[in-house]
Design a protein with these regions (language model features):
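N-terminal Rossmann-like NAD(P) cofactor-binding module of classical short-chain dehydrogenase/reductase
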Residues: 58, 115, 161, 183-184
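C-terminal capping/lid region of NAD(P)-dependent oxidoreductase domains
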Residues: 261-270, 278-300
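Glycine-rich beta-strand-centered segment in the early N-terminal region that forms part
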Residues: 3-11, 19-63
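Short amphipathic alpha-helix with an adjacent loop that forms part of the alpha/beta core around
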Residues: 167-178
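Short, glycine/polar-rich helix-capping loops at beta-to-alpha or helix-loop-helix junctions
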Residues: 64-65, 143-153, 168, 220-226
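Glycine-rich phosphate-binding loop and adjacent beta-alpha segment
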Residues: 190-264, 297-300
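NAD(P)H dinucleotide-binding glycine-rich loop of Rossmann-like/cofactor-binding domains
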Residues: 35-42, 53-118
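Mid-domain Rossmann-like dinucleotide-binding core that forms the NAD(H)/NADP(H) cofactor-binding site
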Residues: 88-166
Length: 300
């Protein structure tokens, strides 16, 4: 048992599904109890032999400033030489989601075209950069000039497409003259509908999320994809990152190496204080945030 002080909490799209009683892959939040999610915390008191005062830990824990919990749901961070919020982004669950979804399901090959939606976000930005490391041509879809410019000028994507522009369909077509071999799906809705028109034979589609429909599931009506999957002999597969837990350690080491080498860059949107949680959620679901959304609760 140990007592910890929360430093950062992670705000993630999947949490929207925990705010309803709809059938989902994760239990809904309980009324009258604190949210729980991924946090970075500092140990301030401990009787556990492996955890000392001052240790920095990460885990799935209640959103409280100070809390006494068991050690079964936490891990020490491997290093404090990097910004701690990275353990909620590229060195945490979003990085694992990007890594395994792309490499284990998407299986990109050198020279192929990889398209990723929500490309400036915590998962999408890492997907695109890993695809570049693997020698692929990468096209990112994002909303607004600032995000699209970030993809091409900061992250070295080969092309960026703004889904908010009226000419989105044509711009996307121009960006993928040789078709699409891997589409990493984070958004769903009309964006996915347009991408599916350009799939190559044997395309792979890892489905990580469908954030466009999280607030309005009743409106999520679009073209039927089955015919395209058959015609293109394409593979579309949903996944939960937990299924790859046995390989988390290896993936973490590789991601950390790429970060240290400057091959993966990150963008973090930081709000300060628990009172900013509602606005952070709104920003996340409307696309107004930039990169990984975290809340800073206290200083180290």
């Amino acid at each position: 048992v140990y007592k910890r002080q929360t430093l950062y909490i992670s705000v993630d799209p999947y949490m929207r599904g925990r705010m309803t009683n709809a059938d989902s892959y994760v239990q809904p939040f309980k009324k009258g109890e604190p949210f729980n999610g991924h946090i970075v915390a500092k140990v301030i008191q401990s009787n556990a032999k492996d955890y000392n005062e001052g240790d920095i830990v990460v885990g799935m824990l209640p959103w409280k400033k100070i809390n006494t919990v068991s050690t079964e749901h936490i891990d020490k961070v491997p290093s404090t030489d990097v910004p701690l919020d990275l353990y909620l982004s590229v060195l945490g669950m979003p990085g694992q989601t990007a890594y395994h979804g792309l490499l284990d399901i998407g299986q990109p090959k050198e020279g192929e075209t990889v398209v990723v939606s929500a490309a400036s976000g915590a998962v999408g930005s890492v997907v695109g950069q890993i695809a570049k490391i693997k020698g692929c041509r990468v096209v990112g879809i994002a909303g607004g000039d600032k995000k699209v410019n970030y993809l091409t000028k900061e992250l070295d994507f080969d092309a960026g497409v703004d889904y908010k522009k009226d000419d989105f369909a044509q711009t996307l077509a121009d960006a993928v003259p040789d078709g699409i071999d891997v589409y990493y799906e984070n958004v769903g809705g009309e964006i996915g509908d347009e991408v599916f028109k350009h799939l190559n034979t044997h395309a792979r589609i890892p489905v990580c999320g469908a954030i466009s429909s999280y607030n309005h599931p009743e409106e999520d009506i679009g073209p039927r994809i089955q015919g395209t999957l058959i015609k293109k002999q394409a593979m579309m597969r949903g996944f939960l990152v937990a299924e790859f837990a046995d390989d988390f350690k290896n993936a973490s080491e590789q991601l950390a190496k790429w970060v240290q080498e400057g091959k993966i860059k990150t963008q973090v949107s930081v709000e300060e204080g628990f009172d900013k949680v509602p606005q952070a959620f709104r920003n996340l679901l409307t696309g107004d945030n930039f990169g990984k959304q975290v809340i800073k609760v206290s200083d180290v």
